Amino acid sequence: MRKQVLALSDTAAARIRQLLQHQQKPFLRLAVEAKGCNGLSYVLNYAQEKGKFDEVVEEKGVKILVDPKAVMHVIGTEMDFVDDKLRSEFVFVNPNATKCGCGESFTTT
């Protein structure tokens, strides 16, 4: 059985729902791009439609499209949302990732 590509915390799902309603978009798209000293960084964008090979993650009332090039790097990842005095951001807990010293990028094993 294949691992779930992406899991959402309740706070992440609530924030995504709020953002999608505000932007009047049906999807949030997750991709990875080459960046930082370790090679990869998470990228989130709004999407109006599903790409031909996108993986659809539907959980807790929201739909996230995972770019096909990102799937192998994010399998088993939990997406959370942190909002405190110092930051307000999505956080990715990826069991396959090794982070770099700068904290801006990761690599998968």
Curated annotation (Swiss-Prot):
Entry's InterPro entries?
Fe-S_cluster_asmbl/transfer, FeS_biogenesis, FeS_cluster_insertion, HesB-like_dom_sf
Subcellular location field: Mitochondrion
| A GO MF term | iron-sulfur cluster binding
**Any one of the GO CC terms:** mitochondrion
| Ranges in a coiled coil | none
Highest taxon of the lineage: Eukaryota
Tell me its cofactors: Fe cation
User: What GO terms in the biological process aspect are recorded for it?
Assistant: iron-sulfur cluster assembly
Q: Does the keyword Zinc apply?
A: no
| Residues reported to bind Fe cation | C37, C100, C102
**What does the Swiss-Prot or TrEMBL cofactor note state?**
Binds 2 iron ions per dimer. The dimer may bind additional iron ions.
UniProt keyword list: Iron, Iron-sulfur, Metal-binding, Mitochondrion, Transit peptide
- The transit peptide region is found at 1-18
The entry's function note states: Involved in the assembly of mitochondrial iron-sulfur proteins. Probably involved in the binding of an intermediate of Fe/S cluster assembly.
Q: Which family does it belong to?
A: Belongs to the HesB/IscA family.
Q: Which PANTHER family match?
A: IRON-SULFUR ASSEMBLY PROTEIN ISCA-LIKE 3, MITOCHONDRIAL, IRON-SULFUR CLUSTER ASSEMBLY PROTEIN
Which named protein is this? Answer: Iron-sulfur assembly protein IscA-like 3, mitochondrial
Q: Which organism is it from?
A: Arabidopsis thaliana (Mouse-ear cress)
